[in-house]
């Protein structure tokens, strides 16, 4: 929710500073996400170019004589292609800080001629990326005036992050009400218009719903004739621009303004484009609407719409249609203020993928008691800005909302917060927030205002009092200390799962959590797909069967990473698999796969050639590592042939304990299995049944902590350096690694080349540098800057030169 400081002060009488207001907003739960304070623009003035003469010593420069509103013109040297006599633009005088250049101007000489300022572009003021020429303003702007004041940029923009329950603060007035309750200012009285209506509108509206599906809870409308739909006033345009809305015309801007000012969404129709009367109903199969955003939406039978005799004219509560939109030719309008079912609005918006400011407010809940008043305020504003004459208001389907009452023991505050607050202060806070109360003593009946649908119980009232009184006044109370737990808390299964995770993470594998249900094709490929494991109501066809193995999910995850440029990958998961639907056929399993060259010792390229592809021995080592971690010595198990047919028959094995207990399988995957799943190799993997491992007689071994991985994608760049033969390649690696120890994840030599073309006693050493972003994705400029620093480091420490 964005608003400007002056906009807030239309509703809140206060002398508090911007910082004080922002601090108070955050303290009461309306957290300030960002403040756009462009006070740095106050030094820029509007100026007019009187003359433009070519610079005698430069082809692209001109000597400008600029009128700043002072007695004497200012001489400015300018190289903009659009600089010319008569142009009105923005001038920065000496001493002004230019944010786009990060410099403070001073008087300087350019090719021997003094310049006493600078005509600025939009980019230099950081107002847009346009830098092809200097700013051009209309000729009727006041010369010498502050550009920031003229453009409305002297008004700070505050952006708060609203939680979904605070629908009352989707308007500036609701925010002002909360601030007034803190004592930082006084809430101004809302001026209610007195409309002098002159006629009855001829348009009728009907609500066509069954009682079981009443999607419109009230519909009010007025007609205004003889309007002039010109541009909205500058003050309104400046505020809309400040919060990111594009001004369109007076009628549309008024509805947008009231939506953000008072939290009351409205819609305005061109009455001359409406055919017949309006019906509010559910959509029909095959109906479409070209909305105001230019897109065409296919409507369904669950979507609430407004229609005339020719079809749908608006998606109710979300967005109007292009056919009845208002433009400069509009002379007669219908202004609509309605109440829509919040759940219906949310469902329609999600189904259509349509987001709007109206939907944002209606699906959270608007004030039902403000429907008529909001329409009156909008009508008065239309009459004031667009002229014309207004009709009497018509209303259908509306019933006054019931006032929710909550019995509130004031002792609840102390019980929940351990704070003693005087009863009088408690009631004052509630009154300032708009709550009424009845009764005396320690228990009162509180009437909840209609704009607070989130207040449903006495705990909510305690929260309201506390956020205004000050959450910082609640003293932290430490939890009671408990005696050390002597008996084991974790079961054997839980302990083994934890130990296994540590062991596999210590071998460089990444833990994965995949779905417990997979497609029937995947299940059949791994010995599953039985009828009793099929879901009755699956999420999708690809998730219709309980998994018989962890491997299908891991293989799909590895392929997804390979498709995105990470062919070398090692994944594991510790979870359950299912042989059938009985409890004793559900097994706790540790499964893992390795892809490409992702061995235990690392993947990638080396100076003496590419690393080998993973094979059966890598899978065997991982499987045995799990057994060792769980306390079973690998020397006690037997390795035999006979792994399931999803493994390669000659490159796989079965791990047994004795002749009967099968602990797991490992091996390279069968090409036919990979082909069924549309997965490319090389790939190997294993599965160990954790619940079949005998309990150890000694404490399980410990392993290293798991890796801390960034969620951002790693970037790799190759560099080749020509260096003296006697220089050790490790020195190049060390020099490259030192360029940025935070971003550079690893440096590896993958090629060493010698040839006379490089020069006598020279060699080429190629390295791969892996960059791991931490806070944000790296831009091309970031990578280029780091590359230059890396080359500089290597050159300085080894005498090498970058090979082109």
Swiss-Prot record:
PANTHER family: PHENYLALANINE--TRNA LIGASE BETA SUBUNIT, PHENYLALANYL-TRNA SYNTHETASE BETA CHAIN AND LEUCINE-RICH REPEAT-CONTAINING PROTEIN 47. Gene3D superfamilies: 3.30.56.10, Bira Bifunctional Protein, Domain 2, Ferrodoxin-fold anticodon-binding domain, Nucleic acid-binding proteins, Phenylalanyl-trna Synthetase, Chain B, domain 3. GO terms for biological process: phenylalanyl-tRNA aminoacylation. Its EC number is 6.1.1.20. Keywords: Aminoacyl-tRNA synthetase, ATP-binding, Cytoplasm, Ligase, Magnesium, Metal-binding, Nucleotide-binding, Protein biosynthesis, RNA-binding, tRNA-binding. Residues 38-148 form the tRNA-binding domain. Its cofactor is Mg(2+). Its main location: cytoplasm. Binds 2 magnesium ions per tetramer. It holds the Pfam family tRNA_synthFbeta. Mg(2+) binds at residues 454, 460, 463-464. Residues 401-476 form the B5 domain. It catalyses: tRNA(Phe) + L-phenylalanine + ATP = L-phenylalanyl-tRNA(Phe) + AMP + diphosphate + H(+). Residues 710-803 form the FDX-ACB domain. It is an enzyme of class 6 (ligase). Tetramer of two alpha and two beta subunits. Belongs to the phenylalanyl-tRNA synthetase beta subunit family. Type 1 subfamily. One of its GO terms (cellular component) is phenylalanine-tRNA ligase complex. GO terms for molecular function: ATP binding; magnesium ion binding; phenylalanine-tRNA ligase activity; tRNA binding. SUPFAM superfamilies: Anticodon-binding domain of PheRS, Class II aaRS and biotin synthetases, Nucleic acid-binding proteins, PheT/TilS domain, Putative DNA-binding domain. This is Phenylalanine--tRNA ligase beta subunit. It is found in: Cytoplasm.
